[in-house]
Amino acid sequence: MNITNIKKEIISFMNKMNYEVIDISYVPGIVQTCVDEFTGDEYEELTDDTMNVKLTKDLVLDDFQEQRLNEFEAYIYFSYHNIVINYTT
């Protein structure tokens, strides 16, 4: 899925929750392949200065973290897609 389609999907998702999207930004990172020391399974890990997120196939759009900036504004970080959404409530 490309970024444009992901953005459309996220805007639709946010609109259903009655939020107005201010901005959607893609957060670049470095993807590296790692091996789980217990199972031996390979997985991709996305790293940069601020994030260390395991990317797995079973994460979906509702796997997100929300952070309030103030009374009216917040952002959501969708870990699987590595996208940050700034929005008003």
Model-inferred region functions:
Residues I22-T89:
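Acidic, low-complexity, intrinsically disordered interaction modules
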Residues M1-T4, T88-T89:
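Short intrinsically disordered terminal tails
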Residues N5-D23:
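Short, non-transmembrane alpha-helical segments in secretory-pathway proteins
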Residues I3-I6, I76:
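Generic ordered-secondary-structure signal
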